[in-house]
A protein has these predicted regions:
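Primarily membrane-embedded glycan-assembly and transfer machineries that use lipid-linked glycans
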Residues: 1-41, 65-185, 241, 245-247, ...
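Hydrophobic alpha-helical transmembrane segments of integral membrane proteins
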Residues: 3, 40-41, 56-57, 81, ...
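Hydrophobic core segments of transmembrane alpha-helices in multi-pass, intramembrane catalytic enzymes
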Residues: 17-26, 53-56, 187-196, 256-257
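A cytosolic-side transmembrane-helix exit/cap motif
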Residues: 42-45, 93-100, 188-196, 208-212, ...
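Transmembrane helices and adjacent periplasmic/lumenal helix-loop junctions
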Residues: 45-62, 179-190
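Aromatic-enriched
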Residues: 199-293, 301, 306, 315
């Protein structure tokens, strides 16, 4: 799966941080798939956040799993490594925080994230209809995307009484590609470990369909077979014409990850909905709990078991 995955070769050519990050994500997923999550598996997560901060998205899940020591160690290491630098180098802290600011969206040929696709789709619709969409609408749409795709995995994290750690880690990893404003093609090597582990654990054809779509090269060569973008820099900041080619190009990676996100969310939500239908509700950390005996979580007592113990004690 690795050797047939085109973003992997692009990553090796560029020599970026994403391959190491993908390896750390793979270690986490393999650990979660093989045994209950424990202290010996916290190190890859801490290392991944120090290496490339996108796996900080796992923090709500780590809190849900009770990995407070890992969260404390990470906080201490971040403070130890970052605060002195920010204090000694003027302007470094604001420069770092600007990575989280997207500003007003615009065309970016190399950006293959979902948020870029949303902008391109809105602009294309306005162009076809002859309507100039206000900048505030674009900004509002970008904000809505971030809120929506963060709210769902967060809700599933606190509502799931028996979290499947592999599913939850995979869902949070796919969230990154939907909410971050700059997602380049080589970044998609970080979603490959998710598909590798899911394909190892299950025989569902959907994982392979999504993998195949992400593994294929983008259709850009068919759009620009002469490689004019290498000499015409303006092509990087203008829409591809005809517009359907622009949308097809930017959707080539974003839509498969969206499908992965939706499929994982449904796999997690389905047993939660079944419990609701049976009038079994759970909300971490407020609920005393249902039977939470899943990997990486502490087993808590249901109200029924507590009542039974009290009854036996009274006898």
């Amino acid at each position: 799966m690795w050797l047939c995955y085109t973003p992997f070769y692009l990553e090796l050519y560029m020599g970026q941080f994403s391959f190491v990050q993908g390896a750390l994500v793979l270690i986490m997923l393999l650990a979660a798939a093989s045994a209950p999550w424990g202290a010996r598996y916290d190190l890859p997560w801490v290392a991944s956040v120090l290496w490339k901060q996108n796996t900080a998205l796992f923090a709500p899940l780590m809190a849900r799993l009770g990995r407070w020591r890992a969260l404390g160690i990470l906080t201490g290491l971040v403070a130890f490594t970052a605060l002195p630098y920010f204090a000694l180098v003027p302007g470094s802290a604001p420069a770092f925080l600007r990575n989280l600011e997207s500003g007003s969206p615009w065309f970016q040929l190399g950006n293959l994230g979902f948020r870029q696709l949303v902008f391109d789709a809105m602009w294309s619709a306005g162009d076809v209809l002859g309507f100039e969409i206000p900048t505030s609408w674009y900004t509002a749409a970008q904000t809505a995307v971030v809120i929506l795709f963060l709210a769902l995995p967060l809700a599933l994290t606190v509502l799931d009484p028996r979290p499947n750690v592999v599913y939850h880690l995979s869902l949070w990893m796919s969230t990154y590609f939907l909410i971050y404003h700059h997602v380049w093609e080589h970044h998609y090597v970080m979603i490959l470990p998710v598909l590798v582990v899911l394909a190892m654990r299950e025989r569902s054809p959907w994982w392979w369909v999504i993998y195949a779509l992400l593994a294929l090269p983008t259709p850009f060569y068919l759009i620009d077979p002469q490689g004019q973008v290498a000499v015409l820099d303006a092509m990087r900041w203008t829409p591809i014409r005809p517009l359907w080619q622009d949308l097809a190009y930017h959707a080539s990676k974003a839509l498969p990850v969206l499908a992965l996100y939706c499929l994982l969310a449904w796999r997690i939500a389905r047993p939660i909905v079944a419990r609701w239908r049976a009038r079994q509700f759970y909300l971490w950390p407020l609920a005393l709990g249902s039977d939470v005996g899943s990997p990486g979580s502490r087993r808590s007592l249901s109200r029924g078991s507590v009542a039974a113990r009290r009854s036996r004690g009274a006898q």
